[in-house]
From Swiss-Prot:
Residues 9-196 form the RNase H type-2 domain. It comes from the Bacteria. One of its GO terms (cellular component) is cytoplasm. GO terms for biological process: DNA replication, removal of RNA primer; mismatch repair. This is Ribonuclease HII. The lineage of its organism: Bacteria, Pseudomonadati, Pseudomonadota, Gammaproteobacteria, Aeromonadales. It is found in: Cytoplasm. Manganese or magnesium. Binds 1 divalent metal ion per monomer in the absence of substrate. May bind a second metal ion after substrate binding. Its EC number is 3.1.26.4. Its cofactor is Mn(2+); Mg(2+). Keywords: Cytoplasm, Endonuclease, Hydrolase, Manganese, Metal-binding, Nuclease. It comes from Aeromonas hydrophila subsp. hydrophila (strain ATCC 7966 / DSM 30187 / BCRC 13018 / CCUG 14551 / JCM 1027 / KCTC 2358 / NCIMB 9240 / NCTC 8049). PANTHER family: RIBONUCLEASE H2 SUBUNIT A, RIBONUCLEASE HII.
Amino acid sequence: MMIDIPDDRLVAGVDEVGRGPLVGDVVTAAVILDPANPIIGLNDSKKLSEKKRLALFDEIKEKALAWSVGRASPAEIDELNILHATMLAMQRAVAGLSIAPELVFIDGNRCPSLSMEARAVVKGDSLVAAISAASILAKVTRDAEMTELDSRHPEYGFARHKGYPTAEHLAILAERGPLPEYRKSFKPVRRALGIE
């Protein structure tokens, strides 16, 4: 059940992926969909198969009026904390749009500081098509980065757990220690470094 969006305003949707993982960037995306060129099958990226996400990823990039990916690094996450780093990454995604939106819908319960009107929408990735599109761009982008990290460090299993603190990942982290891409402010990483 999607929320009706005012079609007289240029609207962007923004979502993030990767607040919970112990490693890598928090990745956000901003998308302005084209009402004249709808995309069928948009939904929260977590509810879609990987195959469907990849197909929609290409379709979104092709059909959207504008799209942008923003991120915050592990160093920024450690310096700012994960919430503030996520807000920064969202600001970067909106700033990267080739067209400035008049209204921005953000998934969740708080908005970053933006130069245009912004509204937080709880469960927005299931309610606002542009947020669904943003969630797909962010998730496919971040998953690809974890697959690439896995190719450099296969012993850590990043392609399987995507950096999330699964039992397998925590055991590997305790045994091998963190790589530079880890978020050193996160408790399991601090524990592995012997500073918790």
